[in-house]
Amino acid sequence: MDVEKKLFLKALKEKFEEDPKEKYTKFYIFGGWRQSARKREFVEFAQKLIEKRGGIPFYNPDIGVPLGQRKLMTYKISGTDAFVEGDDLHFCNNAAIQQLVDDIKRTVIVGMDTAHAVLEKRLGVEVTPETINEYMETINHALPGGAVVQEHMVEVHPGLVWDCYAKIFTGNDELADEIDKRFLIDINKEFPEEQAEQIKKYIGNRTYQVSRVPTIVVRCCDGGTVSRWSAMQIGMSFITAYKLCAGEAAIADFSYAAKHADVIQMGMILPARRARGPNEPGGVPFGIFADIIQTSRVSDDPAQVTLEVIGAAATFYDQVWLGSYMSGGVGFTQYASATYTDDILDDFVYYGMDYVEKKYGLCGVKPSMEVVKDIATEVTLYGLEQYDEYPALLEDHFGGSQRAGVTAAAAGCSVAFATGNSNAGINGWYLSQILHKEYHSRLGFYGYDLQDQCGAANSLSIRSDEGLLHECRGPNYPNYAMNVGHQPEYAGIAQAPHAARGDAFCLNPIIKVAFADDNLIFDFKWPRKCIAKGALREFEPAGERDLIIPAA
């Protein structure tokens, strides 16, 4: 690739204010932690709060290893022009990352056909577009916490739950035309024509409700609460809209359908050692996460679609799931942000896609080990050569496992672009890790590559303990639950073949449609831009409590 075309050079020059190829730099001249405006702000706030804390010591950057011996880097959010401080990418400091997680956790999808069948066949009540519209108006009152069946019921302040609503979608164009547009996710409107036809073919005449439970609920409770909150209000709304008796036996069928039989969760329940209910990050399969991200509706660039999935997944899986649920603390942000900052992964992925297009064409070759070896080797060596040639790039990705993850992600995605096959893609990742280890004798921290050493052996069989198609694997897949710097890239490798083929969805068309919704708080079409807004403090989240606390 021509030097002037390398995507990461602009960021490196801005960050370090020196030639990215310079082999020597300076230390101890930057003013320590004071070079960072954000850390100066942290210290100022901490000093004010010590008295409020009764004198208990608080944030003090002079404790521990001296900060700021080197340049405290800013980070360019890849695919944008925004440069931000690293601290503002920690999920606690970034309202957009928090909302990304909340919007997934607070979503549940419920099939409406069972409930409609109970109404018509068991109770003799006619279901029409008019009654569906009346029900949807009722559920949009009840779901945020409004009472419909009994009086003397306490209700929730609308100002706290303004983000809560329900919508409906169907693959039946005639029914969709009759639904009040305020409630409809219109497949024909939201998707390009070819994608819309593909999705409607899969969904058919079935009808689904999407419930967005209030953000404040998943802040106080957990993802497992969401289907219950939704089901309770669905039951009350059916009783009201169809004028049913609250105590009759058929109501149990509504409850069962809304809580269990027709429920589609975003994430599966986790085992006891991880102890999380449904709709928590650790239970979201990679293919489902790829479908949650909506870039494929608005871009036909396979690399861009894939990179947006990886960027969002880095915050979701590495920063929040592994970095907080499973670990806690501050260190995981640096691992995760390597995949969505400074256009480094973008450069490697576009290099790989260009190589594929020239030699094979997108989806132009059947998967084979020879193809995996060729593409993964080419892209891996390109990435490693950049780290050799540009010391500033090495400083940017200062951890070996950052470099391994980024290089292997580009290799795996490139193989997937060529073959249209996620299994080939994940083997491209595994091979890249092995090549990288041959090149440098090690990758990152001890055990980083543990899962990669055994990956190829169990990716070519479908077994209950080690198998699964790649799109169906997730953070709790046995060998994938171990280490940071893998799961976001795996989500990208799940997306890459479908992006290359121009598929409307990756794993589940119902999930894809559910998030094709402009009323969501987080922008799932352009996650990296949204994360940048969060870092720049320009993002307005939901779930705030200003209405019920003293004015500042």
From Swiss-Prot:
InterPro entries: Me_CoM_Rdtase_asu (IPR016212), Me_CoM_Rdtase_asu/bsu_C (IPR008924), Me_CoM_Rdtase_asu_C (IPR009047), Me_CoM_Rdtase_asu_N (IPR003183), Me_CoM_Rdtase_asu_N_sub1 (IPR015811), Me_CoM_Rdtase_asu_N_sub2 (IPR015823), Me_CoM_Rdtase_Fd-like_fold (IPR009024). Keywords: Metal-binding, Methanogenesis, Methylation, Nickel, Transferase. SUPFAM superfamilies: Methyl-coenzyme M reductase alpha and beta chain C-terminal domain, Methyl-coenzyme M reductase subunits. Its cofactor is coenzyme F430. Binds 2 coenzyme F430 non-covalently per MCR complex. Coenzyme F430 is a yellow nickel porphinoid. Methyl-coenzyme-M reductase is activated when the enzyme-bound coenzyme F430 is reduced to the Ni(I) oxidation state. Pfam families: MCR_alpha, MCR_alpha_N. One of its GO terms (biological process) is methanogenesis. One of its GO terms (molecular function) is coenzyme-B sulfoethylthiotransferase activity. Its EC number is 2.8.4.1. It catalyses: coenzyme B + methyl-coenzyme M = methane + coenzyme M-coenzyme B heterodisulfide. Coenzyme F430 binds at residue 150. Coenzyme B binds at residues 228, 259-260, 273. Pathway: One-carbon metabolism; methyl-coenzyme M reduction; methane from methyl-coenzyme M: step 1/1. Coenzyme M binds at residues 335, 446. MCR is a hexamer of two alpha, two beta, and two gamma chains, forming a dimer of heterotrimers. Belongs to the methyl-coenzyme M reductase alpha subunit family. Component of the methyl-coenzyme M reductase (MCR) I that catalyzes the reductive cleavage of methyl-coenzyme M (CoM-S-CH3 or 2-(methylthio)ethanesulfonate) using coenzyme B (CoB or 7-mercaptoheptanoylthreonine phosphate) as reductant which results in the production of methane and the mixed heterodisulfide of CoB and CoM (CoM-S-S-CoB). This is the final step in methanogenesis. This is Methyl-coenzyme M reductase II subunit alpha. It comes from Methanocaldococcus jannaschii (strain ATCC 43067 / DSM 2661 / JAL-1 / JCM 10045 / NBRC 100440). The lineage of its organism: Archaea, Methanobacteriati, Methanobacteriota, Methanomada group, Methanococci.
